[in-house]
Curated annotation (Swiss-Prot):
Modified residues (Phosphoserine): S1213, S1683, S1692
Compartment list: Cytoplasm
Lineage, uppermost ranks: Eukaryota, Metazoa, Ecdysozoa, Arthropoda, Hexapoda
Highest taxon, organism lineage: Eukaryota
Subunit composition and interactions: Associated with the proteasome.
Protein name per Swiss-Prot or TrEMBL: Proteasome-associated protein ECM29 homolog
The species this protein was found in: Drosophila melanogaster
UniProt entry tagged with the keyword Cytoplasm: yes
Length: 1890
């Protein structure tokens, strides 16, 4: 066989011939399919002539195919040929031509099948590849995506072709970037390169086409064909599209995608940087431009999610600056760019960012500032970024103070919206300028030869201080706030200028005072200062180190130590600044005649702080004013005071003096007293000029003020006046005392006491001998004071007691006679003013002792006076021990059972020890050799034994008193032999008191035990400790003897535990000491545990103990591992007493709480886990609270998986599975047990802890935490699912569900295996979590359907928003078919069997979600779900029905055909049973909404039902339902065409309904027929019309029923298009006539109306019959009940008024319809009938008109109009018939002969009709006048037809109209005026012949 070129050419010729002979598309298609690929293959021929011939053939084929668009081309074979390895370029050229021509002609399924081949063709020529890619773009929106996920990923089969995949995705991205409406002539759009723009603009899409392509691309990207990483960037671009249809699905998919992407992976974020700024390619054609602002906005939103390695500093910098200053940007972009910059500064690689940090700072500063034009939100973001910059790179900020200055200025002048962000920026900058940040060699360089408090600042610091000085007194609060932050952060706390400015702010701004006070004093309230935490720089020696600054900035503000500045430095600075202010006269305040440099508030702040500095510089570490340390202050003043202007103490005295001169206050008076009390000889004489203002203040209403003034006044008199002057002033004061007011007398009495106390002390100090008994002024003062003790005013008694205390302590009181006033014993009147007094003579000592002791005993005396009286007795024993010591001790023992009051007992204890010691124990022993000779060792021993014996007294009053007294005696008399000898006895006594019911007595006893232990030597301490532990743990308390006055329980102590027993701190402490095998530690613990409020007050100051010694702390160190966990648990004990005590111990033992807790974290957690289920409820609560606090770490949960080496579990740990975090799982397990506790408080605490733990677990399991997150999730998720979600306790279920819900976002993939259990549990829980109140309201509203449905709708929305449903929504994306199949039985059971509304709603909603998620994949299960939902739409609750209807709508598109048919059948059956069931319509509506095409396929089933249902009789109940059916009809089959096209299925439905036994269904079918007749009118086919008429005629037979009139109305509607000559017409009229004769009035009314319509349409002559059957109705006066019931009332007298009105209205309506029917039945073509009735009708109408009601009159005139319109006699050609030949004309009931001629008849009719018109004209009724004018118009129209006829009727009309015109014109209605105008126009045109 020949194989050369000729043979090939011959073959090609044959092919050409075959193609030429193909004379049809089918033949051409067959030829092309057979020969095209072999012909193209010939392109590989080596012979040129062959190739030429091939081109000829191919050109012919191309030309033929171009004109025949339906001819298919063998695309698949061409693709295989194109992809073959040996294909030449020529071959590929032609193959690509035919591929691009043939691919669009293929069916969609074929295109989908070939997609992988089209995309996968590897070719070096990009243009060819682009052409192939372009073939797929238009079909992506319609391409069928496989349901199987594995098949989806293989749809394009690009797994092994990464280059092609990347190229295809790049093309998709370029298309998404292409703007709408762009043309080739325009520039390259943002985001594209010239090459990419060229290749996609060639497609020349219109905007709508491009939108469709983009929608297809997004749909394809969301179909899981590519990996998440590959589709991420294209979807971000799509989400920025301007068309809603493109952006919305992209945004939805991105929200799912972002939970799965790892934003710490550079591969995720690198394309974002590139797209944002362009690819910077070196090839110009491939260089992409930066993208547009919309896309940038989206890119930045995802760049902000970058973490770790994905933060690219170089590109990030380019992105941010392009976002700030680039061209393609907007406001939102700038904000996001700044947020990204903040991320860059915070989380970027520090070493790289630090290199460009100054550049970043410059960029930020350009955006903000006073001159910035940027919007507020941009500036806010810039300030936030600046704040982060300052935190990350403080060195950049610290080099430019102008920045801070500028922002301070901005803060003062900017809009309020910027305040918070500028403040944040400034506050972040403050640490950059902090003194502590300088190098120690520079910043802390202090000249050791100079004062240690001097601070060396650099120039920056000085400039900053100057700026802060300007801003400290700013009028803008936030400026002062920021200033205070700088002052507290940038300077050492002992730096005086900074403290000075802070004090200015505290005084001026109330809102900042608390904060500033915290920095200055270590606490927010001045009366809460912990003075042990304060120290002065003067006594810190070399403590000027960074440590103090660190404490200042980092420790808890309430616990940190405070370093006070040197008093001299501080005072010098204050003095300097005050002098400057006074000279400048700025900000000065004038008070009285004194000019102050500061306001009174600022002055007070300065004085308080200066006073504190003074005392601490003097070496005192205690509250200022403490008498024990006055000598130290005296030494300091004596050493440093000089009477020169530059002396700090002199300046202080002047500063205080100026304040006192201006206005006396507590602060300045106490400051003055400090100076005078410490060094009176230095200051008293210089302050005498203050006596006058101070004397005026003695009248002040404030008692405190008078007391403060009196002590100052007393010192000034004693030390400032000479002896003679002193005696003179005192004498004058005493003489004038009786004439002064009460307050004035009180003040002067105190002055006398203070001045004698000071004067006597001064005399003794100077060793001057003076006989005090012979000092007249002194003796006189004692007498007056003694008399005042007996006064009735408590104020004077209080002053007298204080005076006796002051004088009695200083000297023996002279025993002189005195006359006092006492109340008469026989006085019965209780009124003090009416009490009679008797004078008696006595001595001063007798009076004083008796009265003071009586005040102490008296329960009616004021508390303060009783305490002062107790102390007074002790002071008397100091001054006169011989007289008072023995008496005091005897009397005190009688006071044990007085009122139980801690403060009073402490006061008595002070008096006892003062009496025993012979000196004021608060001031200390006068000298070491001092011995109280009035109380020797025997007396002391006897008194001590008496106290110990009273310990066993069961009286609670006595036990409290003895405990306090015994403690005081042991503390202050510890060196007495009796105390040392009775240590063990004292321990037993205190141990006995330790078991008392009173917490206070327990505290006192524990302090006593500690004291006894501390005064013992080391040998006996061990014995005491073992003995104590034995008593506390093993011993038993002796039973108290109960007497009649015994108080069994202290107030507030009963019922503190479930058993009624008393809880003590010491039980826990003993247990701890015993476990440690260190009995002596109990003393340390007890010592630390006491913190009773009474002890922390000034009253208990005498019993305060030192903190833990260094030796004891060192001893505890080895045991901290056991002590710390136990103490940590004890801290949270719910018993306040124990909790506070343990916190006290903790604070003392633990120096840094955070560090210690972190060190012993696992030990503490083990302690808490072991005790979480302890048998005592308070321990369980404590553990719950402690766990919550332990877990609350700044860094989140502490995990085992994060530790370098896993630690072995302790032996006593719970048996748990091998999980990464065993403690975490055990903690959940234990908490669940406690949440099911019997004790409510325990359950509440456990619930709070579990909720908090859930939040921590959610954070810890986040994907951001990598492996540790996985460890947390895998440890707890299975447990929560297995145990928590299905737990019987609702709270446990809620916590579990909430935790799982929140965890799904972060660790969702781990949840998948448990979904079959989880989903049903969540659905069940949805119902249980429902608000019971809403459920109750719904039940109560059962009678009101609308209200109940509204409430149930709220319940449903609430159920959908519960976290259970949110969790289900998150879980859905992890459900596949196998999981759904497993859970289906339980879900279906819930749908059918649950009674909770929430569960039912949740199930329906879940069905909707899962149908969207799985689609066709769930088809096998859809039938089951549809059956369950069908049960739901029959539910009694409307809301449940609605949601199940929606669920069916979702499911039906996925169902099998059999299920669909079955559902539609059931819906029809359900409608037949429950026509009012709204859910049927809702179901069909839902199906139509989601699967419109499906409903079209089953239109024959549903359309008749919809059409029939929409014609239900509407009433209040069914109105909404009918509207819903109508809306559904309009959606499904709008317009008349829908009815016409579906009549073949609608009529059978109506036929069956009309033959139904139900009357309502008959009426409903009639309504539907009426609609058909009305809408289709003449277009209704005659067979269908006749079929319907016959149906109605059949239905009309039989008795009357409710709704039967609808059949007549439908029949009337059908007659409108009926042939009038059809034989059925007579049947129709006969049926209507028959129904019109029925007697029931209402039905007869409607039947007559329908009859009128029928006769009018058919133009039949039945007037006579109609007239005969209805005329009698017009003559009726009242309507009688047509009934056979004899009991029915018939006469109007027997009826009620309402019934009579109702009958009258019915009769009137009947008459109206009769006239309408008569008018319509007036024959149009029957001349004989007209002539027989024409005169009669006109005359009778006129006669009846006047007697009728208005509506009837209107109907009558309307009938007359129709009568005139159809009257044949008005025609010019009309002939009067010979009535003799036919029936005689109807006789008129008058004597006149009837007119014979036409003219006479016309004239007669006109006369009668115009009479009716005239009557109507006079009636004030617009409707009546309108009809009358219509008659006139009709008469003119009919009679003006011929110009040559009789003009008489027209003249009559004109005369009648003109005569009645005025009456017509009275009505101003527009229609009346319009008709009058028409009539006038017509009459004016007529020219009647005369």
């Amino acid at each position: 066989m020949e194989t050369g070129p000729n043979a090939e050419i011959e073959l090609l010729e044959r092919v050409l011939l075959r193609l030429g002979n193909a004379d049809s598309d089918e033949k051409l298609e067959a030829a092309v399919g057979k020969f095209l690929t072999p012909v193209i293959l010939k392109m590989n021929s080596p012979h040129n002539v062959v190739r030429t011939k091939v081109v000829e053939v191919l050109t012919h084929i191309k030309r033929r195919l171009s004109s025949r668009g339906h001819v298919q081309i063998p695309v698949e074979a061409l693709l295989d040929q194109y992809a073959a390895q040996d294909s030449s370029t020529f071959l590929k050229n032609f193959a690509i031509i035919f591929i691009t021509m043939g691919f669009p002609r293929l069916a969609l399924e074929q295109q989908t099948a070939l997609a992988s081949k089209v995309v996968g063709c590897e070719d070096k020529l990009e243009s060819y590849q682009d052409k192939l890619f372009a073939l797929l773009l238009p079909v992506l929106s319609d391409m069928k995506i496989p349901d199987d996920p594995t098949q989806r990923s293989k749809l394009l089969d690009l797994q092994d072709k990464p280059a092609i995949c990347a190229n295809f995705l790049a093309l998709l991205q370029d298309v998404l970037l292409l703007p709408y409406g762009i043309t080739q002539e325009q520039d390259v759009p943002p985001g594209l390169s010239p090459y990419s723009f060229t290749r996609i603009i060639a497609y020349n899409w219109r905007a709508e086409e491009l939108e469709k392509v983009k929608k297809g691309i997004v749909r394809f990207l969301c179909a899981s064909v590519f990996s998440d990483l590959q589709i991420f960037v294209p979807l971000v671009v799509a989400s920025a599209d301007t068309r809603f249809s493109v952006a919305t699905p992209a945004i939805t998919e991105l929200s799912k995608l972002c939970t799965m992407l790892d934003f710490s992976n550079p591969a995720v974020t690198a394309p974002l940087y590139t797209l944002f700024a362009g690819n910077q390619s070196k090839i110009t054609d491939r260089q992409t431009r930066p993208c547009c602002a919309r896309v940038r906005q989206k890119l930045l939103q995802y760049l902000i999610k970058c973490r770790g390695k994905s933060i690219n500093v170089t590109k990030g910098l380019q992105v941010t600056f392009d976002g700030f200053f680039g061209t393609n940007t907007n406001q939102k972009c700038k904000v996001l760019a700044l947020q990204f910059m903040e991320l860059l500064l915070r989380d970027g690689p520090r070493e790289l960012v630090s290199k460009v940090s100054k550049v970043i700072l410059t960029g930020i500063t350009k955006i903000i500032g006073r001159d910035s034009n940027e919007p507020n939100d941009v500036q806010n973001a810039a300030y936030s970024a600046l704040a982060q910059h300052a935190r990350s790179f403080p060195q950049d900020v610290s080099q430019d103070l102008k920045l801070v200055l500028g922002y301070f200025n901005n803060l003062a002048s900017c809009a309020p919206e910027l305040h918070s962000s500028i403040r944040e920026a400034l506050v972040s900058m403050a640490p950059a300028f902090a003194w502590k940040t300088k190098e120690k060699s520079d910043a802390m360089e202090v000249d050791k030869n100079v004062d240690s408090s001097s601070v060396k600042l650099d120039g920056q610091q000085h400039l900053l201080l100057a700026m802060l000085l300007d801003n400290a007194e700013s009028k803008v609060q936030i400026v002062q706030n920021v200033t205070s932050v700088f002052l507290t952060s940038c300077y050492p706390e002992y730096y005086a200028p900074a403290r000075y400015l802070l004090l200015l702010i505290a005084g001026e701004r109330n809102s900042l005072r608390e904060n500033v006070t915290t920095y200055l004093y270590g606490t927010s309230k001045k009366d809460h200062i912990n003075y042990s935490m304060l120290s002065s720089i003067d006594h810190s020696k070399n403590r000027i180190s960074s440590e103090s600054i660190s404490d200042f900035n980092h420790l808890s503000l309430e616990q940190r130590r405070v370093m006070l500045p040197s008093f001299q430095v501080m005072m010098s600075h204050v003095h300097e600044m005050a002098e400057k202010r006074l000279k400048k006269n700025t900000a000065c305040v004038v008070v009285g005649r004194t000019k102050l440099p500061y306001s009174l508030e600022v002055y007070e702040e300065l004085l308080d702080y200066l006073r504190l500095c003074l005392w601490y510089s003097a070496g005192v570490v205690a509250a200022p004013g403490d008498e024990k340390y006055t000598h130290e202050l005296r030494e300091y003043i004596t050493l440093h005071y000089e009477d020169t202007e530059d002396n700090a103490l002199h300046q202080y005295a002047q500063f205080v003096q100026r304040s006192v001169e201006a206005k006396r206050s507590e602060s300045n008076l106490i400051c003055l007293y400090d100076l005078l009390n410490a060094a009176p000889e230095l200051f008293a004489a210089k302050q005498l000029h203050l006596l006058e203002p101070l004397g005026n203040t003695l009248k002040d209403v404030s008692e405190t003020m008078r007391i403060n003034v009196a002590q100052v006044y007393g010192i000034l008199w004693a030390f400032g006046l000479s002896d003679e002057k002193f005696d003179e002033e005192v004498g004058e004061c005493l003489n004038s005392l009786t004439q002064k007011t009460l307050e004035h007398k009180h003040g002067w009495l105190l002055v006398v006491g203070h001045t004698f106390n000071r004067k006597i002390a001064m005399l003794k100090q100077e060793n001057k001998t003076k006989d005090f008994a012979a000092w007249p002024q002194f003796v006189n003062a004692v007498k007056i004071i003694s008399k005042c003790l007996c006064e009735s005013q408590w104020l004077l008694v209080s002053a007298a007691v204080k005076c006796i205390s002051m004088i009695g302590k200083a000297v023996e009181i002279p025993n002189v006679p005195v006359e006092i006033q006492v109340p008469s014993k026989d006085g019965d009147d209780d009124d003090e003013e009416m009490t009679e007094y008797t004078s008696i003579d006595s001595s001063t000592k007798l009076v004083i002792f008796g009265v003071v002791f009586q005040l102490l005993r008296s329960s009616s005396a004021r508390q303060k006076i009783r305490e002062d009286s107790a102390r007074c007795l002790g002071y008397l024993a100091i001054g006169d021990g011989e007289h008072f010591t023995k008496r005091n001790l005897d009397k005190f023992l009688t006071l044990t059972k007085i009122q139980k009051d801690a403060a009073l007992n402490i006061a008595i204890s002070e008096a006892i020890v003062n009496t025993l010691c012979g000196y004021d124990v608060n001031k200390g022993q006068p000298d070491e050799k001092f011995v109280n000779k009035h109380c020797n060792d025997d007396d002391f021993d006897q008194f001590l034994n008496s106290l110990i014996r009273l310990v066993t007294d069961p009286n609670p009053h006595s036990r409290q008193a003895i405990s306090v007294w015994l403690l005081a005696v042991v503390k202050h008399c510890s060196q007495r032999p009796a105390v040392l000898a009775k240590k063990e006895l004292l321990q037993f006594a205190f141990t006995e008191l330790l078991s008392d019911d009173s917490e206070f007595v327990q505290d006192v006893a524990s302090r006593g035990l500690g004291l006894v232990y501390s005064i013992s030597d080391s040998g006996s301490q061990s014995d005491l400790a073992n003995s104590l532990l034995d008593q506390l743990i093993g011993g038993k308390r002796k039973v108290n003897q109960v007497t009649a006055d015994t108080e069994l329980f202290a107030e507030g102590m009963l019922g503190k535990t479930p058993t009624g027993g008393n809880i003590t701190t010491y039980k826990e402490l003993c247990s701890l000491a015993s476990d440690l095998n260190q009995p002596d530690m109990i003393y340390q613990f007890m010592q630390l545990a006491n913190h009773n409020a009474t002890w922390t007050s000034k009253l208990g100051a005498a019993f305060g103990l030192k903190t833990l010694s260094a030796e004891s702390r060192q001893k505890m160190e080895p045991y901290l591992g056991k002590i710390i966990p136990r103490l940590y648990r004890y801290k949270y004990d719910p018993t306040p007493k124990i909790q506070n005590s343990m916190i006290s111990i903790w604070d003392t033992i633990v120096t840094d709480s955070k560090e210690v807790t972190e060190r012993y974290y696992w030990e503490i957690l083990r302690e808490l886990l072991d005790n979480l289920t302890c048998k005592e409820w308070r321990v369980r609560i404590a553990c719950c609270l402690a766990v919550r606090d332990l877990l609350n770490r700044p860094n989140g949960l502490k995990l085992r998986s994060e530790e370098p080496v896993r630690r072995a579990l302790p032996d006593n740990s719970m048996e748990v599975d091998e999980v990464p975090e065993p403690e975490l799982k055990e903690l959940w397990f234990q908490l669940f047990r406690v949440m099911d506790d019997i004790h409510e408080g325990t359950r509440v605490a456990a619930h709070g802890t579990a909720s908090f733990l859930g939040k921590l677990c959610v954070i810890a399991s986040s994907s951001d935490h990598g492996k540790s997150g996985t460890a947390v999730a895998s440890s707890i998720l299975p447990f929560l699912l297995e145990t928590g979600v299905g737990h019987k306790v609702p709270e446990i279920r809620r916590v579990s569900i909430k935790t799982i819900s929140d965890m799904i976002d972060s660790s969702g993939s781990l949840i998948a295996p448990h979904l079959a259990t989880l989903i049903p549990c969540l659905l069940r829980a949805t119902g249980e979590l429902e608000n019971t109140k809403l459920s109750y309201v719904s039940t109560r509203l059962g009678a009101d359907n609308e209200a109940q449905e509204a409430v149930d709708t709220l319940r449903a929305e609430a159920a959908k928003s519960l976290h259970t449903m949110e969790t289900i929504g998150k879980c859905v994306r992890y459900i596949d078919y196998s999981v759904l199949e497993k859970m289906t039985p339980e879900v279906l059971e819930l749908m059918k069997g649950s009674v909770n509304l929430g569960t039912k709603i949740g199930c329906a909603h879940f069905v909707c979600l899962i149908s969207i998620r799985l689609g066709k994949e769930m088809t096998p299960l859809v039938g089951k779900y549809i059956r369950a939902c069908f049960v739901g739409i029959k539910n009694r609750n409307a809301t449940v029905r609605k949601y199940n209807a929606s669920a069916i709508g979702h499911l039906l598109g996925l169902a099998k055909e059999q299920s669909i048919k079955s559902l539609f059948t059931k819906l029809e059956e359900l409608y037949a049973e429950q026509p009012g069931n709204r859910s049927i319509a809702l179901t069909i509506q839902s199906i139509n909404k989601r699967h419109h095409e499906l409903l079209k396929d089953y239109m024959d089933s549903m359309l008749p039902l919809i059409f029939f249902a929409m014609h239900e009789e509407p009433n209040e109940e069914t109105k909404a339902n009918v509207e819903l059916w109508k809306d559904l009809w309009h959606d499904v089959s709008p317009g008349d065409a829908g009815i016409r096209l579906n009549l073949n299925v609608i009529i059978p439905k109506l036929e069956s309904s009309l033959t139904d036994a139900s009357w309502s269904r008959k009426a409903q079918a009639a309504n539907a027929i009426q609609t058909i007749a009305t809408r289709l009118s003449s277009s209704l086919d005659e067979p269908d019309r006749l079929r319907l008429i016959k149906l109605l005629l059949s239905g009309l037979q039989g008795r009357t029923f409710e709704g039967k009139e609808r059949l007549l109305q439908a029949l009337a509607a059908l007659t409108k298009g009926l042939d009038r000559n059809h034989q059925i017409c007579s049947s129709i009229i006969d049926a209507a006539m028959r129904e019109a004769r029925k007697r029931e009035p209402v039905y007869r009314t409607m039947a007559l109306a329908s009859l009128g319509e029928i006769l009018d349409q058919l133009e039949a002559d039945r007037f006579e019959e109609v007239y005969n059957m209805s005329w009698n109705l017009l003559e009726k006066k009242e309507l009688r009940k047509e009934s056979d019931d004899e009991d029915e009332p018939n006469t109007s007298q027997e009826l009620s008024a309402d019934e009579r009105n109702k009958r009258a209205q019915t009769l009137n309506r009947l008459k109206e319809v009769v006239w309408e029917t008569l008018g319509k039945s007036w024959p149009r073509h029957s001349i004989e009938t007209q002539h027989r009735y024409q005169l009669f009708f006109a005359e009778n109408c006129t006669s009846i008109l006047a007697e009728s009601t208005r509506p009837v009159q209107v109907s009558l005139l309307a009938a007359l109009t129709k009568y005139i319109e159809r009257l044949h006699v008005f025609d010019e050609s009309a002939q009067v018939p010979d009535l003799t030949q036919i029936n005689q004309e109807k006789k008129i009931k008058t004597e006149e002969t009837a007119p014979k001629t036409r003219e006479a008849i016309v004239e007669k009719i006109c006369t009668d009709v115009l009479a009716a018109v005239a009557l109507a004209a006079g009636v004030p009724h617009s409707g009546l006048k309108k009809e009358a004018l219509n008659i006139v118009l009709m008469l003119i129209k009919r009679l003006s037809g011929s110009g040559n006829g009789n003009q008489q009727p027209l003249r009559l009309i004109k005369q009648s109209f003109e005569s009645n015109l005025e009456k017509f014109q009275r009505d101003s209605a527009p229609e009346i005026r319009c008709r009058i105008k028409d009539i006038e126009d017509k009459l004016s045109k007529l020219n009647p012949q005369n």
